[in-house]
Structures are given as C-alpha cells and as structure tokens.
C-alpha cells in the first residue's frame, strides 16, 4: 500500500484517530461514567493550615435524608487506612485523625444520592479545631522555633525531610575560588499548579459477589495505582481493575494517589454501591499535587572572556505537609542535577534540602520532567546574569559555551550521559528565524525613545524517558514499560500499551510507530490503553517517557513480529529466510521482487495451516518489556521578544520562536501541538501563575479567578521549527517532546523581561512578572513573591 | 419543579430542584456529557453551550432560566451524519489534544462564524478569550476556525432546487 | 434589596468546597411590576436573578444564600434597550454587556462605555451579564460603576408605586451596597448627552477577564476651550465615588497636558488602594495616576473631535 503525504504509513503528519469521538462530544471522561445506583462523594476539608482536631460531629450530616454514609479518619483507622504511603516513601493522611496540616486537607467523606446533596451535607459536619501556628515560609521551616508539622512520624523532631547532593563540591569550590568572575543570584521557582481543565476524580465500584474492584480514575499511571491499592487497601491485586478512560489533561497532576480515590473505594465497599468522587476546582488547586516551589541560591563562575567554568546551587525544596512527590526513589530531588545545562563546564555541585511546610503536598508536576524545569530555569537565568555581568550578548555567551557534537555522548559533571546533540546548529537556526541581529538593532532604536523592548534567549537540555530499572524505580517498581502487539489473521492489528495518553495523541503516534516498522496502515492498528485488565504493566505517562520507553517497546515488539513474519514468509515462498529482503509492508525474494508476501498475507498464513519450522509458534503476536539503557536528552533553542509598558509595567509577549530537537519525529503536527502547549505554560508561569499563601497559611490561589491561566489573547502566534539529532540508543532514535516547551519557555521569557529592563539596571526578577512586580523591579525593589 | 428545555431542537422535561445548573441538567439528567465543567468561578469555559445562538457558560445558568430559549450543545453540531465545518476544522488543524475544552471552543467558533463568516486571527482570539485550553496553546484552535471559515458547508438547497 | 453578598475576599475564605448553590425557591417574573410584586411578597430573603454572573457565582461559593430567586430573564426585552431620548441616553437595566459594547450610539456619543466593555469580563460572560446586575452588585473593582460615576449617570429605581432617580453618589453606598431598597429594582440608567462631552476608560489587568488592578474613567465637557464639567472615577483602588479634588482642579481651566497631569496626581493621591495579589498599594496608586492621565487625554481629544 502506498504511503501518501496525507496518509503516511509510518512517520509523518497525519490527523489524529482519537479526534472522532472528541469532536462529537463523545469522549468518555471519569465524570461521564454513570453506573446504576451510583452515589456521590464529597470531601470536607480543613479551613485552616495547622490545627489539632478536637472533635468531629457528623450526626447532623447523617440525618440528611439523602446521605448514605459519612466516613472520618477514625473510621479509616479501624481499617488501617487513615494513612497511606506516598510515592516518596512518606505517609499521607487519607482523612485527618490527629491534626490537619494544610488548608484544604481532607477531614471527612460524605456519600449521598447526588452531587448537590453531598455538598449540602458538608455544611452539616461540625469540626472543632485548635489552631496552631503555621509554617508557611520554606526558608523558615528549619528555624529552631518552627512548629513541628509531622509529629505523627516517629523520630521526627523538625521539618526536615532530606538532604541530597550531586556533583563534586570540592572541585566546584576550587573552580569558583580561582575564577575571574563569580555571579551569585537568589531565585525562586514559585509554587504553581498544573491545573488541567478536567479535575481529578474516580468512580469506585466494588462488586461484593466477585470481590472485584473496578476503579475508573483520572490516573496517568493506572498499573502503578493498581499495585498501590493492593498494598494499601489489602485487596488482592488481581481483583483490582483500574481504568483510565479519556483524561482531560494530566500534566503530572494525575500521577499521585489522592485521598479522594481511597475514600471512593472505601465508600463503595461500605455502601455496596458504586461511588463517584469528582473534586471541584478549588479542591484541585488547594490540595492536589502542586508544582515547583524551589528556593534557589545559584552561582556561576567564568573567565573574563565568558568561558563558564562552574555552576553551583543550594536549594530549599518546599514539599508541603507530606512528601508525596513522584520521582525515582534514588532521586529525591528528581533530575534537578541536570542543572549543569547545555554547557561544557569544569565542575558543578548542588545541594537540595527538602522541608515540610503547612501547605498542600506535592512539588513534582506541571510538566517538570522531574525537576528539569527547575534545573533549566536555574542555569539559563544564571547564564543571563553572567552575560549581564560581563556585558556579553546572551546568545553569543551561549555559543561560546555550548557542548559540541563531537563531545557526545557527554558525561556531565553530575553524572548524566547526554546521548546526542548538535546545539550550535539549533541555536543558530532560532537566531536566524527570529532575525536576531535585526531585533537587537530595533531594540537599540526603541531604547533611545524610552520604549522597553526585551529579547530573551534560552537553551535547554532535558533528561527524560525514565528509565533504566537498575537506577529508576517508583516505590520499588522499575520504570520499564511494555507493549503487546497482536496481528490478526486479516492483517489488522492491536497494540496494547502501558502508558496513558491525556491528550498527547498516543492512539495515533503509536500506531504510526508500528506502521513504520511493519507497513500496516495506522488506520488498521487499534491502540489500546488505560485498562489494567487488558494492557501490559508499566509506570505510565509523565516525564515525557512514553515515546522513549513505550515507543521503544512498541518498535521492538513490531520488529519481533517482523522477524517472525520473515520465517513465515520463507515457509510460504519456499526460500530460506536469508533469501528474503524487506520493504515496508512485505518480505520479498532477493533478486525476484515480484515474488513476495505482504504482511497481511503473512498474518493469515501465520494463523493458518502452513507448516512452520521446529520451535516456531503460530500467529504473529509479539510483546516486549523495555528497559531503557539511558535517559534521552531532547533539547532546544528558544528566543522571545517582549514589550513592557514603561508606565504600567505590563508585559506583552510579542514573538516567540522555538526550535526543538526531539530526535526522530513521529508526527510533526502532534509535536508542534505539544510545543505550543508548553510555550503557553511558560507565559503562564512567567507572567501570572502563582499559588500564593498568606502568613497564616490560607491559600490565595484556590480558584481560577486567582490562579490565572493564559488565554488566547496573551499568547502570540507561536513560531516553531526543528532540528533532528536522533538518540543513538533508542530503537527509533526518538527522544520525547511532551515537556520541552514547559521546561524551556519560562527562563526564556524572564530573560526577555530582564533584558527589557536593562535601562533600569535590573539583574533578576522572580516570577510571576505581574505588572506590579515588574514595576517594583523598575523601582529597584524586586523581591520574591513569597 | 418541572423544567422543560429545548436542546438541539428537542424538548426535554425533567423534575429538578430550582438550583440545578444547566450544565448538570445536561450531563446528569439528560446524559448529554459532551458539555463539561472545570471550575467553580465561571472562568474556564469548558461548559460553554449556545443559547439562542450565542455562547453562554452553562455552569452559571439555571436550567430553569434556559427554559424558553434554544440551547445547542456539541451533540447538536453534527446533523444527519454530516459534521459541522468547525468539527472538521478542529480535526484538520489539530485544534484539540485532550478534548476537554473542545466542545465549548467549537460552539463559540460556530457562533462566531454565524455572525462573522471571515474572522481575522485577532477576532478569533478575542472570541475564545473567555475559555481556557491547557493543551494546545491556542494557535491550532485559531487555525481550525480559519479552516472552517474557508470551508463553509454547502448551503442547503432551496425548496425550488430540490427535485421530486 | 435586602440579602447582601459578603465580600468575596481574595483570601478565598470558604468553609467548604462547593460548586453548587444552596437550595432556594424559584419564581419567574413576567414584567417589572410582577417582579416588584414578588419582591414585596417574598421579602428580604429574595434576590433578583438577571444575567447571573454576579449572583450565581456568589451562591455557588455559598457566600450568598437567598431563600428565593426571582428570575427576571424574561424582562430582557422590556428592560434591554439603549436609546436616545430628551437629550439623554437611556439604558435599560437588563441591557447586556455585549449590547453596550456593540452600541453605535454609545460608541459615538459616550465611548467611555465602549472602552470599558472591551475589557469587562470576557465575550461569553458579556453575552449574559447585564449593566443592572453589575451596578447592583457594586463590587469595588467593578468597571461600570466607575463609568456611570464619571459621566454623572442618574439611576432610576422603581418600587411598587413609586419611581425615584438618584445620582451615583447616592446610589453607591459602599462595597456591595447600593441605594436600591427592599421591594425596589433598578430599571434604567440615564446619561445626559452633550456634543462637547468627551469620555474614555483605561484599565490595567493582570490578564484578560481579571478584575481591574486599577481602572480610571474620565468624562470632560468643554466649552470655548475651557472645561465646564469633569467627571473622574477610579475602580478597584478604594477611591470615592468620583475624585472630586481632581475634578475641581480642571473646571474653569484650559485642559493643558500639565493640568491633566495635575488632576491625575490629585486622583491618585486621594484613593486608598490595598495591597493584594493583584498588586501593591504603591503600584496601584502609581497606575491610578497614569490611567487617569491617559483617560483625561483621550476624553479631551474626543471632546475636541480629534479622536474616534
């Protein structure tokens, strides 16, 4: 079958297969699930950040005619479920027992006939609190007089969680000591929130007769969740089925197991009916996994000519009231140690101290690639601070320091082995597309007239695709993912995956991977995902890992099928397997191309009666579990133009050019979409997104009126392009793209804003750069938002 | 109380509390789950439906108020198996990823094109500025609407043109 | 109007996470008279439901919980109009934001309305939200209150057997408080037309659709090159209904740019902004001055017929 430009068989731009249901409003999201007799749950949450629970009176709520049950922490204690393990080997309260430790913490669970009555019943629960002083500032969490938040933990006498270091401190100190220039800068990556348009929720249906629990859930990792429920709830794992139906955006928000899910499960067991729990937006913003909140002290050392020699950083990581971040066990600060960036440096060191505060738990979310957002922000801002100090153009400074292609695979000073890269080419391409020289000339002219125009450059290298099982596990589950390919007798196929799309287009791109390997058209390949009963085990989708891990598994499974097809074809054509050659879609006899068999014909024969060699089984199915040998390292060069109103300090993003390199490109249309989404995240974080708190720990970012997300009017028409530097260790050379733009755009925009404010001598301004905060910087009073 | 609402040219009567919001009426009472909800403060716009041809946020409208008006939801865009050009446009130009904001975006696009068949990029961005998308970055949504503007459905034949 | 919504503080102080209003009884008004009758019958626990964008969000957050809602959606034709009559523009209280935005009459004679509507909420909200609903909610950051104050609008309030007209100073009692009493409703807004009147509105917001960080409306009437009347009103910065000192600085003088700047300084000095997530008090005061100056400049230019 011929491949065409509109309908590629394999890689190329093709429209998405999943669109058909979404454009008709026939997506099946968790809140769309309706089961007979289904009840609705709602959570009563703490109004205060830190308090002892004196009493909980649920009697009035139980009197409500539509209420079926009210569950409290005390009830869960009886089931040993009041606390659950987190993905970081800490514990988290499902429903509070002794204390509440953040505003919005779960205190009671009401189950009622419908969502309206469930919420009415919340007002009938009377809780008496004894307020305690709250720890809100992470910098003060380790003060001697700071109240101890986790007094539930044995041997916990302060708010310290962990210390973690990477790199060589002695070597780094030495480099800094002899450097011509050292620039130091405090910077904050403020607390933000992934805020997908669909909030989190679950429908739990415990079948008392079969003993099987079916859980529809907004989860990016259904299999991992299943295992967690087996461990936590003591339910046998084969009696748990987790279904991620369509998910309305994940962005890392839907990786953790939330108390609401556990309550829904308990609720179904207790009432004998299906129980739906869907959080509303304030709950999502106030209690589910936030992102970032890294207080950083960075330093960069260089020669006078602008050769960067060392980078160092100390971080206070605010993890909230429970350490519930998701990242591989050995890396409590995720992959932050990729802060070494895209540069050839002599030494680097980082120390990260994790602390508890009276705020919602989390930290790893919002497309951070396990803290790569924080790392890239740090290094790209430091490079610009250095450029400012030395008076060197920031693009020029980067060109003097970027790693060269012949240096790859490159082992950076904190141990990462970057797989491949041709950085200069990508940066120059971005500069050419945006017309960098021309922009600098325009800027000079505008500055002369008092206008504030800024040009920001950012270059990033990510570390994604976790990961090798030797190094990377979450809760002891190795981060390997599988793929199962079945090719039916009529030559159509089904691919079952362990990863979980939330909009990334897996139903299309993974079919394209199989199509590329086997020549079966993508429309003949059904991609199945999200149901733990029918898909292979894996750790799910986040950290841009689907293409690097499951994409590899898929390609390898397809190749196994192709190898099997060769044997079947050799039986069909009565030649030796070595006499066969492959062209996409068929094996044919070398030197006699007319004589061949299409993959469809081979499929039928494989299931048929043809005699196969000894040891060769029938059918054309194949499966793989992929253990990546390394992470992959997508990279990119971003350049942004902003204009700042000198009187109101309002920032407008005028242009944004993004040149991404994600290795082999499966579907350019989908890649572009992923990049556009991430660039918008950058506008959000750089200009307006902030989960703020007052000094009592009241959350000030608990609605979309306060937590501002960009609209179409804040975003320019994105300009994107690409380079291709395949990953040498990946079966199809692909690196992943999902989080690149979220990683690379915030520092690029901040760099542009600081550049615009050069006439005011501004060295740094923390995000979000709201008009008021930019104005403060112009007055010489820049300060972190919290 | 009894509430009768006309949705996609069909009347539905249900007995509901006065406080029932139109979005829940559509989703929970009628099973029309194409209309979504995503916030508590009328900001996100995933609940947008058309009322008398104009976009409204169904989370901020009582079902009772909707009585007496003509409501169109995403389920009403496709007619007799023929997709609306906006639906086609969103598929052609990758105007959706997770699909959650999409019904509202398409309906607003439909209303815009009905008033202004050839909108500029700026006018499209303005029209969707009350609705948030976390996935697409909006540029492909703008392209999708432009595609629909450039590929309007063939006008329905007049009664004289239809042959017996 | 009796049941008052408590201030929606930025501290988002809510007891319980909810998404739906508390229960209430519902009635549909068939006319203004019928609405007033119902208000009287049902008493202080009844609220009028117009566009719904001020009241329903409050009710969903359980910050307001009236026992009765009187739906006046059906009054949209009776009370939805913008017309010129007797040297005035008369706007029905149920006129939608979108109608105000698209009004040719307002764009040419009172463009302060058009300027403001461009930056009020978002296009979807503007399809339903009404001027009456906005004015009666009287949120201190609400733009149309400042617009009406700047142009010296008269509010027509009708009761069962009586109709009275008040100016903005009397109408705006304080945050979330207006002069509309029990068993009364706002029915019309009237603004005197003057060919020598120019008006404009300026606003800074963190993002489209957000409440103002600061906003300023100005209306200037000139005669023989001299200011005969000036209306200056700020939103979101704790200002008085209008900035009287600033207005007085202009009346009787030629509107030079220095004079406008001076008036802007008076306006900025007289307001009482609060620091919050939208901005520091200092920033808001600074921008109050900037925007007042900009609004005055454009109002004067329009009065002189020099700007669309």
Predicted regions and their residues:
Chain A
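Flexible, low-hydrophobicity surface segments
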Residues: 1-159, 182-185, 260, 467
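Glycine-rich loop/linker segments at domain edges
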Residues: 12, 18-21, 85-86, 157-202, ...
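Extended active-site and interfacial segments that coordinate phosphate-rich ligands
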Residues: 17-21, 123-132, 136, 220-222, ...
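Short Pro/Gly-enriched beta-strand edge/turn motifs at strand-loop
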Residues: 79-81, 177-192, 277-284, 325-328, ...
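Short acidic, glycine/serine/threonine-rich loops at helix termini
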Residues: 81-85, 121-124, 195, 217, ...
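Thiamine diphosphate
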Residues: 246, 250-272, 276-278, 506-514
